[in-house]
From Swiss-Prot:
Main enzyme class: transferase
Keywords: Activator, ATP-binding, Cytoplasm, Kinase, Nucleotide-binding, Nucleus, Phosphoprotein, Serine/threonine-protein kinase, Transcription, Transcription regulation, Transferase
Assigned EC number: 2.7.11.24
Organism: Colletotrichum orbiculare (strain 104-T / ATCC 96160 / CBS 514.97 / LARS 414 / MAFF 240422)
Modification Phosphotyrosine, positions: 173
The protein's name in its UniProt record: Mitogen-activated protein kinase HOG1
Protein family according to the UniProt entry: Belongs to the protein kinase superfamily. Ser/Thr protein kinase family. MAP kinase subfamily. HOG1 sub-subfamily.
Upper classification of the organism: Eukaryota, Fungi, Dikarya, Ascomycota, Pezizomycotina
Length: 357
């Protein structure tokens, strides 16, 4: 049985195994608190994320289970990787991952980025997305604060499964809205991996200009700002809108022509403008893919087709439509944690573990 130690961080009890020391707060998110710590086993600095009240509701339990499954499955240089996971005696869940030091949001607010950094960061984002999309996974909430960077400019995408659009907690997130694809924002249709390409395009534009491209005050204002730059969506896209209210709103907007992006990004390379134009397209099916983007001239300095891997197998989403009670999610989560630690246990043993707590 692991020995646990307690510390108070931001008024919250952090209860971790004695393997970790020197806890320092890094940040508070919507669903968890993140601290840096020293892993005494590897002598490396790590990030420890406490998931707040993971078993308080079936929705939160399912969200936590989804994030755990994704972290276990996704293994790529440009995706955050799991190095440990445990449930504390107080029944909080802790994910331990690499510590990268900063994120793209902090970098963008501190200084303008030089061309070679923009290219290298975008290359790594698209390299990570190629892998993630090949696994049948859509991030759904890609934004600068979800893109971690270290002092060597190594980049990793994080917070997978954290923001399902159906989660009511996410609807008010201004930072999320800036990067959200039109088909999600206006609930046009079932969305797919293309939403991440739109978000990456918004991030690319922000790296080029140093400020958010579409800083909408709300969804209506957001869509209006998008059409000011990209013009009115084509009729074949408008006709896919299922919601009558949304359709009425879009048709009520004044007709606008798409503006040449070179007029807005006057200092950007023509190849950067060309790639950005291929990413910010209303019709999801006409957006460039991550694989295609990696072959684009703008990313040529870093492109290596022999070192841009895809997932060995698709992620298993079979649990995603399940409507289960908290205790069942808890047992499933405990089973996943035991599997991660290569511990064999029967379903009965797992159930007895929880009934005994």
């Amino acid at each position: 049985m692991a020995e646990f130690i307690r510390a108070q961080i931001f008024g919250t009890t952090f209860e971790i195994t004695s393997r970790y020391s020197d806890l320092q707060p890094v940040g508070m998110g919507a669903f968890g608190l993140v601290c840096s710590a020293r892993d005494q086993l590897t002598n490396q600095n790590v990030a420890v994320k406490k998931i707040m009240k993971p078993f308080s509701t079936p929705v939160l339990a399912k969200r936590t289970y989804r994030e755990l499954k994704l972290l276990k499955h996704l293994r790529h240089e440009n995706v955050i990787s799991l190095s440990d996971i445990f449930i504390s005696p107080l029944e909080d869940i802790y994910f331990v991952t690499e510590l990268l030091g900063t994120d793209l949001h902090r970098l963008l607010t501190s200084r303008p980025l030089e061309k070679q950094f923009i290219q290298y960061f975008l290359y790594q984002i698209m390299r990570g997305l190629k892998y993630v999309h090949s696994a049948g996974v859509v991030h759904r909430d890609l934004k600068p604060s979800n893109i971690l960077v270290n002092e060597n400019c190594d980049l990793k995408i994080c917070d997978f499964g954290l923001a399902r659009i159906q989660d009511p907690q996410m609807t008010g997130y201004v930072s999320t809205r800036y990067y959200r694809a039109p088909e999600i924002m206006l609930t046009w249709q079932k969305y797919d991996v293309e939403v991440d390409i739109w978000s990456a395009g918004c991030i690319f534009a922000e790296m080029l200009e140093g400020k958010p491209l579409f800083p909408g005050k709300d969804h209506v204002n957001q869509f209006s700002i998008i059409t000011e730059l990209l013009g009115t969506p084509p009729d074949d896209v408008i006709n896919t809108i299922a919601s009558e209210n949304t359709l009425r709103f879009v048709k009520s907007l004044p007709k606008r022509e798409r503006q040449p992006l070179k007029n807005k990004f006057k200092n950007a390379d023509p190849s950067a403008i060309d790639l950005l134009e291929r990413m910010l397209v209303f019709d999801p099916k006409k957006r460039i893919t991550a694989t295609e983007a990696l072959s684009h001239d703008y990313l040529a300095p870093y492109h290596d087709p022999t070192d841009e891997p895809v997932a060995e197998e698709k992620f298993d989403w079979s649990f995603n439509d399940a409507d289960l009670p908290v205790d069942t999610w808890k047992i499933m989560m405990y089973s996943e944690i035991l599997d991660y630690h290569n511990v064999d246990a029967s379903a009965q043993q797992i159930e007895e573990q929880f009934n005994g707590q």
